[in-house]
Amino acid sequence: MARYIFITGGVVSSLGKGLASAALGALLQARGYKVRLRKLDPYLNLDPGTMSPYQHGEVFVTDDGAETDLDLGHYERFTGRPATKADNITTGRIYQDILTKERRGDYLGATIQVVPHVTNAIKDFVLSGNDEYDFVLVEIGGTVGDIEGLPFFEAIRQLKNELPRDHAIYIHLTLLPYIPSAGELKTKPTQHSVKELRSIGIQPDILLCRTDREIPKEERRKLGLFCNVRESAVIEARDVDNIYAVPEAYHAAGLDDEVLAAFGIEPRVPPALASWHTINERVRNPEGDVTIAIVGKYTGMKDAYKSLIEALSHGGIANKVRVKLDWIESEVFENEDPAPFLEHVNGILVPGGFGQRGAEGKIRAAQFARERDVPYFGICFGMQMAVIEAARNLVGITEANSTEFGPTKEPLVGLMTEWLRGNELERRSQSGDLGGTMRLGAYPAMLKRGSRVSEVYGGATEISERHRHRYEVNTAYKDRLEQHGLKFSGLSPDGVLPEIVEYADHPWFIGVQFHPELKSRPFEPHPLFASFIQAAVVQSRLV
């Protein structure tokens, strides 16, 4: 039977519960255990799909088409286990399911209440589908004391009593701030956070304390005494130079040993951390640097591009170089020459996005890369802008545009109205809902034999990648674009939807309709990112 580890947070938000959960999952996995990670999000949205990137950050898409929290990206990258829609749930989804059952009459006239109906739904979600796993790590979003989180805390409180003895523990991630004027770490915020947790019936078994320095023995003793945990269970979560150093740092601090001890488990074997050590050696001791410009719309909120940042880092690890990112708001050069902003970089990446704001700047970035032979990687919206640039400046279709921006005589990019998902036809309309109505999840693509992208994928002629988009390049313009050098080297199996474009006579210019960053791992960098950074390395030696 699976054992459960519930991870909560206190004092402040954004302490890194998702990263801590992923790192602990990786440590348990490195000891030979089968691990599953799940996220409970207390907000009322059904999913983050329609939330602003400035508020929520990236929307991470799973193979089965779920739009989920970015923490699931950490889970995948650290454990290699693909997440599914069954690994993330929100208050909104729970309420929707309960109200649907109530309308059907499933509750036989009962009064629907937070306890027991909402808490039971949360417990059912947490316990479902875990038979094949040794450990299930469950992260509760938000911080202790948030009103919207109370049903989730109540549910995990009940679960510990309902599960067999020694089958559930609580880890509380907290902050130990250093006050320079006092010259010491302060434990009071953590004490009050644990007091709040205990007031709702949850006694943490382990304290994971975020800090920028070593925790003195006296402070450990104080935390153990006032928070009612063993001194050995006060774990130091020291700041590290890169996120892939976290598993080794947490192991050195004794987190995985303390977790096993809390369950009464004798460690099988020491964790196999050699691969993590290799990654960190490459990150800390690169053989060179490359600079990549990210020309985007949400550059003020780096979390909006979380998987992208990590995938570029993985490309650097594969090539033993440090990837420096130059964030450029695409509006900056909508009406001026992009050269002063881009002539120093070794590669240009235009990521996914929505809406007209900044689009012309992205088109100019694609033109600069094409004309100057700078490696260009266009992802989703970035591919569409590269196609519009080619249509305008190579084919001569000066009014080429996307219907996403309004009516146009030359719709190079248009709304997808139907596509196949397996054997089922899915349809969308301009007037439909925004939430959950995109082409979402993993779809196959057929690669042109002998194309550069086929070579990047090791000679493959069929791939599967994750999508999140409503608009698609119009194949009616395919022949004219190919006559001017822009090759459609990847199509959907039915040949209707363009998936990949490239210039054969360019050092490296590839646009993809999907999001390859979602499948990149530190141990297994996505081939497109590894190849893109390799091209940037070559470019850096030419400058």
UniProtKB/Swiss-Prot annotation:
Purpose: Catalyzes the ATP-dependent amination of UTP to CTP with either L-glutamine or ammonia as the source of nitrogen. Regulates intracellular CTP levels through interactions with the four ribonucleotide triphosphates.
Family per similarity comment: Belongs to the CTP synthase family.
Name under which the protein is recorded: CTP synthase
Protein's organism: Bradyrhizobium sp. (strain BTAi1 / ATCC BAA-1182)
Catalytically driven reaction(s): UTP + L-glutamine + ATP + H2O = CTP + L-glutamate + ADP + phosphate + 2 H(+); L-glutamine + H2O = L-glutamate + NH4(+); UTP + NH4(+) + ATP = CTP + ADP + phosphate + 2 H(+)
GO cellular component, one term: cytosol
Binding annotation for L-glutamine: Y54, G353, F381, G382, M383, Q384, E404, R470
BP GO terms, sorted: 'de novo' CTP biosynthetic process; pyrimidine nucleobase biosynthetic process
Primary enzyme class: ligase
A Pfam family that the UniProt record links to this protein: GATase
Subunit structure: Homotetramer.
Active site: C380 (nucleophile), H515, E517
Regulation: Allosterically activated by GTP, when glutamine is the substrate; GTP has no effect on the reaction when ammonia is the substrate. The allosteric effector GTP functions by stabilizing the protein conformation that binds the tetrahedral intermediate(s) formed during glutamine hydrolysis. Inhibited by the product CTP, via allosteric rather than competitive inhibition.
Miscellaneous section: CTPSs have evolved a hybrid strategy for distinguishing between UTP and CTP. The overlapping regions of the product feedback inhibitory and substrate sites recognize a common feature in both compounds, the triphosphate moiety. To differentiate isosteric substrate and product pyrimidine rings, an additional pocket far from the expected kinase/ligase catalytic site, specifically recognizes the cytosine and ribose portions of the product inhibitor.
Superkingdom classification of source: Bacteria
